Curated annotation (Swiss-Prot):
One of its GO terms (cellular component) is PeBoW complex. It comes from Drosophila willistoni (Fruit fly). Pfam families: BOP1NT (PF08145), WD40 (PF00400). InterPro entries: BOP1/Erb1 (IPR028598), BOP1_N_dom (IPR012953), WD40/YVTN_repeat-like_dom_sf (IPR015943), WD40_repeat_CS (IPR019775), WD40_repeat_dom_sf (IPR036322), WD40_rpt (IPR001680). This is Ribosome biogenesis protein BOP1 homolog. It is found in: Nucleus, Nucleolus; Nucleus, Nucleoplasm. It comes from the Eukaryota. Belongs to the WD repeat BOP1/ERB1 family. Residues 1-152 are annotated as: Disordered. Keywords: Nucleus, Repeat, Ribosome biogenesis, rRNA processing, WD repeat. Gene3D superfamilies: YVTN repeat-like/Quinoprotein amine dehydrogenase. WD repeats lie at residues 438-479, 481-519, 564-606, 609-647, 650-689, 693-732, 748-778. CDD domains: WD40.
Amino acid sequence: MAKKQDRKRKVKDEATNDGASGSDQSDNAEEEEDLLQTVKEPGEDSTDDEGIDQEYQSDSSEDLEFESDEEGNYVGRKGGQQESSDEEEVDEEEEDDDDDDDEEEGGKVEDKPTTSSKAETNNEVAPLPALPARDPSKQEYEDSDTSDEEDIRNTVGNIPMHWYDEYKHIGYDWDGNKIIKPIKGDQIDDFLRKIEDPDFWRTVKDPQTGQEVVLSDADIALIKRINSARIPNAEHEEYEPWIEWFTSEVEKMPIKNVPDHKRSFLPSVSEKKRVSRMVHALKMGWMKTTEEVEREKQQKRGPKFYMLWETDTGREQMRRIHDPVSAPKRDLPGHAESYNPPPEYLFDEKETKQWLKLKDEPHKRKLHFMPQKFKSLREVPAYSRYLRERFLRCLDLYLCPRAKRVKLNIDAEYLIPKLPSPRDLQPFPTVESLVYRGHTDLVRSVSVEPKGEYMVSGSDDKTVKIWEIATGRCIRTIETEDVVRCVAWCPNAKLSIIAVATGSRLLLVNPKVGDKLLIKKTDDLLAEEPSNQDIIDNERIKTAVQWSTAEAAEQEKGVRVIINHFKPIRQVTWHGRGDYLATVMPEGANRSALIHQLSKRRSQIPFSKSKGLIQCVLFHPVKPCFFVATQHNIRIYDLVKQELIKKLLTNSKWISGMSIHPKGDNLLVSTYDKKMLWFDLDLSTKPYQTMRLHRNAVRSVAFHLRYPLFASGSDDQAVIVSHGMVYNDLLQNPLIVPLKKLQTHEKRDDFGVLDVCWHPVQPWVFSTGADCTIRLYT
């Protein structure tokens, strides 16, 4: 084998050096052959003093090296597989010299001993199979699975193509132009193509471009191989010859062969000194054995106690040691567990079926057993659950944690907030003083003159009555064409005007009571019609409201101005200055709320969109703000900036009414779900306090203008007077104390108190009810 390798080297040198002679080559070959001969005599030992075999005859190191091209691709083994051009030349030379090699080797074998020839025969290694040379110019990913080099016409990416079903195009090309879908044929076209086109069976549709593609023979072959569960590439060889990259022969050689140092053979001087010191310590009694040392440490530590499951260094663990908690005692047996229980403890058929029905859910049973009755104690059988109950008891004793809980004996009065006594909060109404009778149907609304001398009421009997508060005498009755829903006296003391909402008309009435000069001034103001030539009204306003002067017949009743609306009016409210008033029409959609100006006889629609079914509106007493209450929420608008300021969340089903504190920082809301809500406008958009003082729907609430009082009326025929103090200190919360429950109205058709109103000067409250009366509480 070595000689054959030398031949190959010689042939390669001949290819590189053309001027070398044939005789020199043979001499060089003989010299190289002599260099590889063994140098020992037969039977001579080749091991050295350390027992290492110095005889080492190795194959050429070039057989274990490999060649690669510039790109790092495998080309072949050095001395084994060369470039294609070199291989042809070497093969030709080897064919010519095969005979000479055989003769020379035969002579050599005859001269050498038999053992050496066998060794050479065994050491010969079969040549490794040649690998195909790789072309460096070939692209790295030419035959791989990468899709980077694919020619993709449609650049939409990996998306579902059915997204383009609604469009005429199916994607975009590299230039950004749309790829138009091809024309689709019908079933007849498909049938003709199936008959006439010989390539119809190998035609498929490209989902990316929508074009029809004819499969080539290579594609058909690839599909067939995949369908038959074979490797797609036909050129791929599954069973390639194994290349032994690493030799299987283990070579044992020493890493280093350094002789031992002299001190390794001599005793250690330091150990000698240490032993002498230890001997001296033993003689003097200074040194002790390990057992003696451990015994002394144990005596110092003393006996050691520890918990079975965990350490006892924690506070709870120390408490368990020093202050153990005894196990709770089992409950004593009851009458149901007796062998002869009373008949009422035995199950009937219904209870027995229910007990057996809960077999899969035994924890839902009231008793874990079924009571039985025996004539005598000796007839009682063994208890089947005895072992299980003992086992569960043991589990509870050592697995369940124990703790002492101090029972808090809290007095109920301690939980009630400390409120001042009602006697300290006087004055407030306590008794019924007057009953105003005269209406024949429900009295829905009541309002008091700013000076507190007269009162006006509206009823379902289509009348408006003006009363003298002190005497209870009805001074005047004004008949209307429809049910009176709401009445409101102008808060401006310089005017004597009553706004009456009856049906879809709003009547401005001069009651003709009180100061005659004031009555004449009011008539002059209402009789004067301002010139609105420069003002162009919107069509929405014209169709929603119309101003007109009352006719002679109504003038005699005191009606001066009539404002006709397009829907029935439910509520009317005045601004604090008495020049503006607002009306509510729940059926008016986005025109439900209207604001009227008395001096200019103009109307405005503040909202263009409906935010809900409007129930009532209110003017702020100090700021230019407008409160709008829908069924569930309350919105506060700025009339100057014309924007929403705040939205109050009531968390109620239906709002019935609202009233604002004279200072303007607190709002009281009544709801049909038996609640009263107190809102602190500076604090939050949610109720500061929710009061459930009534048993039925709360229909009306009202603040007093001077005293810290508010009242509420409900369908339970009760008027509840409460104390509501608002402090100037913003850090102090309002004080709310219920004071008195006044219940004198009669209930009719499930209706009770419909409206409440405070006297502007005195701590008196008026209430109207379904019993056709108006009652004064003082």
